[in-house]
Amino acid sequence: MHDANIRVAIAGAGGRMGRQLIQAALALEGVQLGAALEREGSSLLGSDAGELAGAGKTGVTVQSSLDAVKDDFDVFIDFTRPEGTLNHLAFCRQHGKGMVIGTTGFDEAGKQAIRDAAADIAIVFAANFSVGVNVMLKLLEKAAKVMGDYTDIEIIEAHHRHKVDAPSGTALAMGEAIAHALDKDLKDCAVYSREGHTGERVPGTIGFATVRAGDIVGEHTAMFADIGERLEITHKASSRMTFANGAVRSALWLSGKENGLFDMRDVLNLNNL
């Protein structure tokens, strides 16, 4: 990677998240917008990326081919769909480019592909790039160690009507943080739906509930409920810029790293708390 500004490429530049990633890249010192990508056939191809994001002219035009911009970036930032992200991952691995991956909804094979690629390139892969959410994950580990064995644990998440995966990647990360603190595997204790005559709640399970409505950016609550009291830890996002800023900050953090798989807690040094 270059010693000067880290040059980033933004996938899905015309989407809601893509435009805010462009804004964040243009605003953060030490980062340079090197490329912006959209799908083949998009009406946005050829547009100026800065103007597309409402940030003024940059001279970076939206392209559809990674090959065409392979010399213009050091780190690829991707918040698109799993199938597209995995294609981008293969390209970045082949060409020695770092990646920041905020895409959610990967199956186990997709996650394994990311782990495999990290042997050759540096990757920050996180379900949520908000500072607050990652502090919350640390708090959940602490709460679970104290209260997790005797309380009923539920995770409730809400997002906008356009979100296509459920539960959210952040909700799953919350469940994994709690399960790990309790020396459990989330696959063995998660309950994702309840309908009809379910019987009494099974002790030791982690329940998930999902809301999809309107323009909710993202709300997540973990509940540790006992008889007579309950603890709720909640994070509410009011703007996607919190995720965009965290992702671009992660790209800058990757400077000088040749390979390895990291998450936002590494970027924020939360693992040492």
Curated annotation (Swiss-Prot):
Subcellular location: Cytoplasm
Chain positions recorded as NAD(+) binding sites: G12, A13, G14, G15, R16, M17, E38, G102, T103, T104, A126, A127, N128, F129
Principal location listed in the UniProt entry: cytoplasm
Keywords from the named record: Amino-acid biosynthesis, Cytoplasm, Diaminopimelate biosynthesis, Lysine biosynthesis, NAD, NADP, Oxidoreductase
Residue sites binding NADP(+) per the record: R39
Top-level taxon: Bacteria
Signal sequence range: none
This enzyme's EC code(s): 1.17.1.8
Annotated metabolic or biological route of this protein: Amino-acid biosynthesis; L-lysine biosynthesis via DAP pathway; (S)-tetrahydrodipicolinate from L-aspartate: step 4/4
GO CC entries: cytosol
Example GO molecular function: 4-hydroxy-tetrahydrodipicolinate reductase
NCBIfam families noted in UniProt: dapB
Primary role: Catalyzes the conversion of 4-hydroxy-tetrahydrodipicolinate (HTPA) to tetrahydrodipicolinate.
Quaternary organization: Homotetramer.
Protein name per Swiss-Prot or TrEMBL: 4-hydroxy-tetrahydrodipicolinate reductase
UniProt source species: Shigella sonnei (strain Ss046)
